[in-house]
Design a protein with these regions (language model features):
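N-terminal Rossmann-like dinucleotide-binding module
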Residues: 1-52
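C-terminal helix-rich "cap/oligomerization" subdomain common to oxidoreductases
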Residues: 2-5, 71-73, 307-355
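Beta-loop-alpha module in the N-terminal Rossmann-like domain of NAD(P)-dependent dehydrogenases
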Residues: 52-115
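Hydrophobic residues in well-ordered beta-strands that form the structural core
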Residues: 58, 97-98, 123-125, 268
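A contiguous active-site-proximal alpha/beta segment in oxidoreductase catalytic domains
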Residues: 103-172
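Mid-domain beta-loop-alpha active-site segment that forms a flexible
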Residues: 126-133, 164-214
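NAD(P)-dependent dehydrogenases' Rossmann-like dinucleotide-binding region
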Residues: 144-185, 216-224, 242-245
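Contiguous beta-strand/loop segments that form the cofactor/metal-binding neighborhood of enzyme cores
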Residues: 191-192, 198-274, 295, 302-315, ...
Length: 355
């Protein structure tokens, strides 16, 4: 820690903080130092803070009142994100990183936009792939594909997170999830909604970039695969979009994004979240020719932290909060309509069994 490094305060010290953000910050000790860690579980707060020589607390207000905390990172459960972003803005912090989603409704997002404008506080949302050098390189070179793409595919195959969390660090505590009765229409709808707002939301901003008519969302089909995940086929404006994920016991994760047009196509393969393995690799194909961008030396998590430092120091322009609201609005639309479709199909299947 030096006077030139930026002081970080972390709200929520669960697996994402322990296995992703702290290892990322350990690569950026010339830029950041962790000042204080807050968690509602005092044992977790103390354990995680001890790893980085930081103070700990169970009180959000105590962390926000700490003048050495210049940047606030919000890794708490989703339902607390909006109020904590607002509180951090009002506390006069230099920049805020909020894990996705940064709000659970459009009204909450609009309140954040108002407060951020009043306090002039820059905010970024932890959609890490939007900061990945592979994605950024693709943006510079995809040309008219952004308008000519007719098919978008976004796919995740995800082994159990704890396997990779344990490789990355010693996790102090994990939330426990009860078994779910997926034959209950409300439970099935909740699983789809949670999957989209918890997992798909990572790259829905990438999908939205290719879908200018993002408010025109039609769910063509929606399936809840075993053991967990989602398979959603959408029509977004004039684009066909497939968003899918499956949680499996396989060894290798796969996280891909594709945009396909008549004359060109893009495929991006992202590196695993829990491994400091460099950036995504983007391949743009135009006829028989291929252009490859990446992998670069760091991933999207490190990219978002680098950008956060520039925001705090005022060396880059803040992101347009309106765009963050549009990203959230699109995610909510997909989640709500997909949940409704699964609720209806599950109820219909139950009625058929009972007949």
């Amino acid at each position: 820690m030096t006077a030139s490094t930026l002081g970080v305060g972390i709200l929520g010290a669960g697996p994402v903080t322990q296995a992703i953000h702290l290892p990322t910050l350990s690569r950026l000790t010339d830029v950041f130092h962790v000042v204080r860690v807050m968690d509602v579980d005092p044992a977790v707060a103390e354990s995680v803070a001890g790893r980085v020589g930081a103070a700990w607390t169970t009180d959000v207000d105590e962390l926000l009142a700490d003048e050495e905390v210049q940047i606030v990172v919000i890794c708490s459960p989703h339902q607390f994100h909006a109020e904590q972003v607002v509180a951090a803005c009002r506390a006069g912090k230099q920049a805020i990183l909020c894990e996705k989603p940064f709000a659970m409704s459009k009204a909450q997002a609009e309140e954040i936009a108002t407060v951020a404008a009043e306090t002039r506080t820059p905010i970024i949302v932890g959609a890490m792939h939007t900061f990945d050098p592979g994605w950024l390189a693709a943006k510079e070179h995809w040309g008219d594909l952004i308008t000519t793409a007719h098919t978008i595919r976004y796919s995740i195959v995800l082994p159990p997170n704890p396997r990779f969390e344990d490789f990355a660090t010693e996790v102090a505590s994990r939330p426990r999830w009860p078994a779910a009765d997926r034959n209950d229409p409300e439970v099935a709808a909740g699983m789809i909604y949670g999957g989209i707002m918890g997992l798909a939301i990572h790259d829905l901003p990438l999908v939205r970039a290719f879908c200018p008519d993002f408010t025109d969302v039609e769910v063509r089909s929606c399936t809840l695969p075993y053991p967990a995940g989602y398979l959603v086929n959408l029509r977004v404006g004039q684009k066909d979009v497939q968003v899918s994920a499956v949680n499996s016991q396989s060894w290798e994760p796969e996280w891909t994004f594709e945009a396909i047009g008549d004359r060109s196509a893009l495929r991006i393969d992202f590196s695993p979240s829990y491994v400091q393995a460099g950036s995504a690799t983007a391949v743009i194909r135009r006829g028989p020719e291929s252009e490859v961008y990446g992998p670069y030396s760091y991933n999207g998590y490190e990219g978002e932290w680098r950008f956060l430092a520039e925001l705090a120091r005022g060396t880059v322009e803040p992101l347009d909060v309106t765009e963050l609201i549009h990203d959230l609005t699109f995610a909510l639309e997909v989640a709500e309509k997909s949940a409704a479709a699964v609720r209806e199909s599950t109820a219909a299947a139950n009625e058929k069994v009972m007949a």
